[in-house]
Amino acid sequence: MNNLKYSTQTISKKDIISVSKVLKSELLTQGPVTIKFENKIKNLAGSKYALAVNSGSSALLLACKALSLKPGDLFWTVPNSFVATANCGILCGLKIDFVDIDNDTWNISIEKLENKLKIAKKKGKLPKLIIAVHLGGLPVNPLKLKKLSKKYKFKIIEDASHSFGGKYYLRKVGCSK
């Protein structure tokens, strides 16, 4: 029987020494290493800003809070992601609904999203936010998502926890550009 690993990591001796050095320093979370790390992440992600946090869950919550949405506003995401993707909106007082996934990529189905948006527009119940997950290293088509965002006036959070550093053609995943 073959065992399939969900994920693997490579941690070198240099990594261990670097982490140990920070752990022994006076400034664990707000020191020069954190600033250097944030600058590297900013460059890697192709974003204007970067903020180091303890987890992807915290990053999603901060992103959601930064949008200044109102309690009761509607947001949509996928049903097959880690619970933090849904929880971040709920913790901000938003109401959740789900969009079905693409059977080939397991990401949000752009086609099903567009159909759901058309129906929601007729009912006057459009979402203020879509949280798209780039699941398992397979990115959502950001160009189509952005086009729908402009047409239906919703904000986008890209959860790139599974695809960090990835690209969709030449566009870096997760920067909502």
Could you say what each language-model-derived stretch is?
Residues G93:
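Structured binding elements
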Residues S81-A86:
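Conserved coil-to-alpha-helix start sites within the AMP-binding
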Residues A52, T77, L129-A132:
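A short beta-strand submotif of the Rossmann-like class I SAM-dependent methyltransferase core
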Residues W76, D97, I156-I157:
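Structural detector of well-ordered beta-strand residues that form the stable sheet scaffold
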Residues P79, D97-N103:
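Short beta->alpha connector loops at strand-helix junctions that form conserved
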Residues M1-L27, P32:
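N-terminal "arm"/small-domain region of PLP-dependent enzymes with the aminotransferase-like
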Residues D104-K177:
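Active-site phosphate-binding strand-loop segment of PLP-dependent enzymes
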Residues L27-L74, C88-I90, F98-D100, K122:
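Phosphate-binding glycine-rich loop
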